Amino acid sequence: MEVLDFEAVRAIVAETPDSELIRWVDEALREKSGYTLPPKIHIAQQDGDYYNVMPCIYERGNIAMVKMIGRHSIKRGEDRSSMMGDILLYESDTGILRALMDGEYITTLRTGISAAHSARLFTRPDFETVGLIGLGNIMTVCIRAFIASLRAEGDRRDVTLKLIRYHGHQQRIMDLFREDPNVHFVLCDTYEEVIGGSDLVFAANIYGRAAVPDTPYRHSREKYFI
C-alpha cells in the first residue's frame, strides 16, 4: 500500500502540465456513465462544521474509492487548514487497499480545474476580460489552468484579468503570469468593479453571486458566472 501525503500529491501535480489536468477532468466527465456514484453523505456538526463522505466504483478501471472530507473551525493554538480530507483507493474486484492519499490538495485541484474546464466549454468564444472574485488556492489553480489551456492550443489572445484588492492576494495571481506579456491586470476596489465589463466571472468564495446582491450584474445574461 502506498501512502501519499499532501507534499507527495503536490509534487506529482507540479510535474503535470495544467492542460493535461484539464484533459483528465474532460475524460472523467465523458466516462461518467461508467462510474457508480451513490449520493454524497453529509454529516452536520455544531457551528457549521461537517463531514462529507463520497464513495465511488469505476469497474472498467478496477478501482473503488472513498473520499472523506471535513470542514472544522480552527481552534486556538492550532496550525492546520480548516478543510482537510483523505482518500482510500482499493482494487474493486478484491477489496485490497492500494493507497491512502491526502485529499485536501486533490479537492482544491479538482474544484479549480473543473471550473476552468467549464469556462472553456461555455463562455463566449471571443472573451477578452475575466473577473476574479476570491483569490485563494482554488482561484489560483483555476485561472492558471484556464490560461494554460488557451496557450496549449496556440491561442495567444490578450486577456485582461480584473482582480479585487484584498490583503495583497492579488499579487499572487499577478505573479502567475509574469512571463506572459498577453495577460493584463486591472485592480478593483469593489465586486461591482470586478464584474462590470467582464465577459466571464469566476467566483471562488462562499458568497458567489450573492457577493453583489444589489447590482444589475447578478443575473446578467451577457456574462458567464462560475
Report each predicted region and the residues it spans.
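Rossmann-like adenosine-cofactor binding region
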Residues: 182-226
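Short helix-loop-beta connector
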Residues: 122-129, 219-221
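N-terminal ligand-binding/catalytic initiation module
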Residues: 1-108, 114-116, 126
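Glycine-rich Rossmann-fold phosphate-binding loop(s) that bind the pyrophosphate
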Residues: 135-136
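Aromatic pocket-lining residues of Rossmann-like dinucleotide-binding sites
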Residues: 146
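N-terminal Rossmann-fold NAD(P) dinucleotide-binding loop
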Residues: 139-140
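NAD(P)-binding Rossmann-fold cofactor-contacting core
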Residues: 149-178
